Amino acid sequence: MRDKIKLVSSAGTGHYYTTTKNKRTTPEKLEKKKYDPVVRKHVLYKEAKIK
């Protein structure tokens, strides 16, 4: 089953993306470089739980 996760910006802006991931095939935390419109740069986004 695919679980919903939140990708939070490491720039500290509070911006985030939501996506899904298959926890059985990728049990480790997801890290991805994506665009942060607040700082207008590509920064590292790290996985966090959706509350």
From Swiss-Prot:
<dbReference type="GO" id="GO:0022625">
    <property type="term" value="C:cytosolic large ribosomal subunit"/>
</dbReference>
<dbReference type="InterPro" id="IPR011332">
    <property type="entry name" value="Ribosomal_zn-bd"/>
</dbReference>
<dbReference type="GO" id="GO:0006412">
    <property type="term" value="P:translation"/>
</dbReference>
<keyword id="KW-0687">Ribonucleoprotein</keyword>
<dbReference type="InterPro" id="IPR018264">
    <property type="entry name" value="Ribosomal_bL33_CS"/>
</dbReference>
<dbReference type="Pfam" id="PF00471">
    <property type="entry name" value="Ribosomal_L33"/>
</dbReference>
<protein>
    <recommendedName>
        <fullName>Large ribosomal subunit protein bL33</fullName>
    </recommendedName>
</protein>
<dbReference type="InterPro" id="IPR038584">
    <property type="entry name" value="Ribosomal_bL33_sf"/>
</dbReference>
<dbReference type="GO" id="GO:0003735">
    <property type="term" value="F:structural constituent of ribosome"/>
</dbReference>
<keyword id="KW-0689">Ribosomal protein</keyword>
<comment type="similarity">
    <text>Belongs to the bacterial ribosomal protein bL33 family.</text>
</comment>
<dbReference type="InterPro" id="IPR001705">
    <property type="entry name" value="Ribosomal_bL33"/>
</dbReference>
